[in-house]
Amino acid sequence: MTSSMIIRRLATDWSTAVRYLLAPLIFGEMLLCTIIVLKRSFTHIDWRAYMQEVEGPMVHGVWDYAQLRGETGPLVYPGGFVVLYASLRLLAGGDGTVVRPVQWAFAGVYAATLGLVAGCYALARPTRVPPWSILLFCASLRLHSIYVLRLFNDCWAMLLFWLATYLLCRGRWKLGCAAYSLAVSIKANVLLTAPGLLLLLLQAVGPRGAVAVSHVA
């Protein structure tokens, strides 16, 4: 394939755009995330509250949600959040104070999410969105802040949501619904997309199949 053909297909074909642009894009994003982690000040307030909220189960053996709280208020996130951030607390020195390893983990989550989003677009092949727009995936300053400076649970929830979307695009209904359930367990606002998921299941496998798939998930 000549260079002119590649350029033409980059403008018209999502699969070609993902094949040629995704790897350099993710590499550049990892370099940018590294610079941000090393040069920008970490935002402690949300992370500190998260660590306080999971301190009860980890340190005191308290699993009663009514007693779990941080400096920003009571714990409002589902059980998957508690398990995830308890694990991240261990990664952060056991008490949540050594944040740098966690920032690298979140940078990896960011890269994986970019890859999944690009994969979903390649499978969907939207006709009204030009393939070169994959370059705009990394244009948000706020996303970089959320992923490597604030360490929000949204990052993990969206990773699992886009994994679910990718699996559903490939017709892997049970695995897709399982990934979707895990996303909901980390942040419940993922449930806002549940009506769309239900419609897809009804169209693909019918009412009985949708019930069977939901039981597996």
Question: Residue ranges of each PLM-predicted region?
Answer:
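Multi-pass membrane glycosyltransferase architecture that uses lipid-linked
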Residues: 2-217
